[in-house]
Amino acid sequence: MKILFAAAEGAPFSKTGGLGDVIGALPKSLVKAGHEVGVILPYYDMTHAKFGDQVEDLFYFEVSVGWRRQYVGVKRLVLNGVSFYFIDNQHYFFRGHVYGDFDDGERFAYFQLAAVELMERIDFIPDVLHVHDYHTAMIPFLVKEKYHWIQAYQNITTVLTIHNLEFQGQFPDSMLWELFGVGYERYADGTLRWNDCLNWMKAGILYADRVTTVSPSYASEIRTPEFGCNLDQILRMESGKLVGIVNGIDTDIYNPETDPLLAHHFDKSDLSGKLENKRALQERVGLPVRDDVPVVGIVSRLTRQKGFDLVVEELHNLLQEDVQIILLGTGDPAFEQAFAWFGHAYPDKLSANILFDVTLAQEIYAASDIFLMPSRFEPCGLSQMMAMRYGTLPLVHEVGGLRDTVEPYNVYTGKGTGFSFNNFSGYWLTWTFKEALKLYADDKEAWKSLQEQAMERDFSWDTASKAYSDLYQSLL
């Protein structure tokens, strides 16, 4: 099967979040399963800095962006059997970052037009064209409405994956003819219109042959007003083509037996290396080195979506317990300042590291006893899966992908891989936090059993890619 991905980012070339991880891992896993896979990405300046001497210049052409003709340079790099094709235009993509510019609408309108026209020029006409999030959500519309006259495109099946419904690509209706060069008809009849704006995500949902999200629970949640971000009505209408598939993680990278970023390796049969890592982490961040105290790790963006308003609200109560909390992350300045203040107020209990450091992140995943992830909503989440690979038990809000990947501890059966609370409130966060600490202190055997169960869970991309392969096959 020929599968082509189009996305705004993809590891290792460009990455700001979970989307980049997926584009870096899923195509590679599909190649292992015997498929022919290509990926179309923007050629950012950070891509050029890291891979400029490895990419191959193929050719260039021009694409119409409204009334203008814009340069499209095409580069290629084959990595892990995947053919990565890069759209090069320094005006749009040499910005020092991936997102956040005033003209993001124009940048990704250009990218989508270039990606659609590129398929014919590289002679890669896929069986399945898989697009991701709003940045590429207009591609199914373009294939079926603007480029339908190209015979080679008429049998392409399109799939849209929603990684985060909160970001929808809402722009003025004039973009349709000023940038995409299409008529007003589909806006006038309401197909592309939502809240008096052109809505790219709505277009993708309606025009894609199948819509996926990154967990089954999130697929259910976004059909409700609470999580639907004003598109729940459309998603309920299209629920027959909506499916959730949990992301995977790269189990070769996140492997406690071989991880090169760890000083001490371990496995589920011998966790002594985890204790050595815990001692080293406590020493590194300036906390008292104690084996008996539970270490709670946090690696996250500090935002309301990630639940840190709840954490800050309850932090004084949490720090009354015999516990150490090690935080790594940046985000909302108010949360950064709050954690910094608590770090000064409780120097023996809280280490607030307001930065991002890949090595420290790995050490926190591997050395902590508990991993705190109280997200308000979480389409999938990867951190909880990474933590479990290292025998670190997640404490999560029971929502989205967290619900699908973390089995809450059952005191009667001893089964579970972590702890969860259902009601998003400070009371239940604190109650669950204290229950986890109590189990850690009182029942070492039960705790070790939970660690072993967590480390046995299969979060590899092989499982996820098999689900995607079956989905693709069902559409052909």
Curated annotation (Swiss-Prot):
Positions that bind ADP-alpha-D-glucose: K15
Pathway the protein contributes to: Glycan biosynthesis; glycogen biosynthesis
GO molecular function: alpha-1,4-glucan glucosyltransferase (ADP-glucose donor) activity; alpha-1,4-glucan glucosyltransferase (UDP-glucose donor) activity
Keywords on record: Glycogen biosynthesis, Glycosyltransferase, Transferase
InterPro entries from the UniProt entry: Glyco_trans_1 (IPR001296), GS/SS (IPR011835), Starch_synth_cat_dom (IPR013534)
Key word Glycosyltransferase present: yes
Top-level taxon: Bacteria
Reaction(s) catalysed by this chain's protein: [(1->4)-alpha-D-glucosyl](n) + ADP-alpha-D-glucose = [(1->4)-alpha-D-glucosyl](n+1) + ADP + H(+)
Cleaved signal peptide residues: none
EC number(s) reported in the record: 2.4.1.21
GO BP, sorted A to Z: glycogen biosynthetic process
Record-linked Pfam families: Glyco_transf_5, Glycos_transf_1
Entry-linked Gene3D superfamilies: Glycogen Phosphorylase B
Family according to the record: Belongs to the glycosyltransferase 1 family. Bacterial/plant glycogen synthase subfamily.
UniProt cross-references to NCBIfam families, sorted A to Z: glgA, PRK00654.1-1
Function comment: Synthesizes alpha-1,4-glucan chains using ADP-glucose.
Protein name per Swiss-Prot or TrEMBL: Glycogen synthase
Gene source species: Streptococcus sanguinis (strain SK36)
Gene (UniProt): glgA
